Amino acid sequence: MVVLALTLLVGSVAVFSLGSLLWVVGKHFWTEHIPEGITHPWRLRILSCLFHLTMTWGMIFEKLGLCYAPQFASFLHDLKPLKRDPDVVVKDLHFGTIPVKLYKPKKPSSIPRLGIIFFHGGGTIIGSLRTHNSICLRLSKECDSVVVSVGYRKSPMYKYPVMKDDCVVATTHFLESLDVYGVDPARVVTCGDSVGGTAATVTSQMLVHRPDLPRIKAQILIYPLLQLIDFGSPSYQQNRNIPLLSWDLAFYCFCCHLDVNISWKSVVKNGMHLPPDVWEKYRKWLGAENIPERFKNRGYKSIPWGPVNNDAYQEIKRSLNYTCSPLISEDSIVSQLPETCIVSCEYDLLRDHSLLYKKRLEDLGVPVTWHHMEDGFHGVLSALDYGLLSFPCASRIMDLIIQFIRKF
């Protein structure tokens, strides 16, 4: 009987796993598009299917009341062994209640080192101190820097503004303790990818009001999310079905973070969540006329205004806060920001965020170094150490970031 029960259990698990895999692969080929401009398209297909497979399993566990889907996906992602470097000392610490990883070169330094505050990406729902460990190791070793990676709390368990608050608290703690970690207060950089770029941007903007703290020397924004207001720009239309960040996944993350009902998807997609007078207030910064024409060549049509759904607007209007959408911060704040390095990717749903923020910064006299990855897609840097599933684009981004940081 025991053997029979085990056989049935193993068989059920095998059928479940195979069925899930076939569903994910079929859905990928039916709904997602890999442009010719992306090198190694099959690597991206495999990564996309693996991610959606973990989320599919997670959704099943969520329906059973066992955990949230992103929690299960994060659990599986964190099973990947951590890379280590004999030249870098890594410590797991807490800044108050916030977990952080501290990376410091083993070789002693006669002078205070440059400091990097790193915020990982993951759409506010996944990503961790472990998933971005290799990036932080390289930054510490190759820039001879002290790196603090912030383990902020994530959605859907923790809604806005918890992530923002955690990042600001951790940054403030570090800036108040630079001498403890051997960091030069005149050389502190913030850095982040995706929503980590959001955190780096928001933190830098909020620190403008803190003259009592050391001033941030530079910020590095890697395909950042910078506004949650307009979802009809050229990159949203061109890259809507391109992994690793499709429109469906982006809106799911949006709803998890801001506690918005996912039933508003079609309303938001068609721009019916925003009253015309509100759009006019921010159009000077978000309008497609601010985007160079060459980025509209793959297709763009202006979305005509439809009837506004006031219920959707009332639920979503919290995104008009600059801590959600730092692209709409006032000139008096943006003009005081430090030198900025921005990395954008052609096949990224959020590409235009980088283009619009670059223009805002430059218009206000803030020095900007911009790198555009013609073969890049959202999330490519997170696959930096994935071996056969990594991309040359990720290595180029890493090299450019290191080159920028070494200036300071």
From Swiss-Prot:
SUPFAM superfamilies associated with the record: alpha/beta-Hydrolases
Main localisation: membrane
Glycosylated sites: N321
MF annotations from Gene Ontology: carboxylic ester hydrolase activity
Glycoprotein recorded as keyword: yes
Compartments where located: Membrane
Top EC class of this enzyme: hydrolase
Involved in the stabilization of the negatively charged intermediate by the formation of the oxyanion hole, short sequence motif: residues: 120-122
Matching Gene3D superfamilies: alpha/beta hydrolase
Listed GO CC annotations: membrane
Keywords: Glycoprotein, Hydrolase, Membrane, Transmembrane, Transmembrane helix
Record's bilayer topology term: Multi-pass membrane protein
Family the UniProt entry places it in: Belongs to the 'GDXG' lipolytic enzyme family.
Record-given protein name: Arylacetamide deacetylase-like 3
Organism whose genome encodes this protein: Mus musculus (Mouse)
Gene: Aadacl3
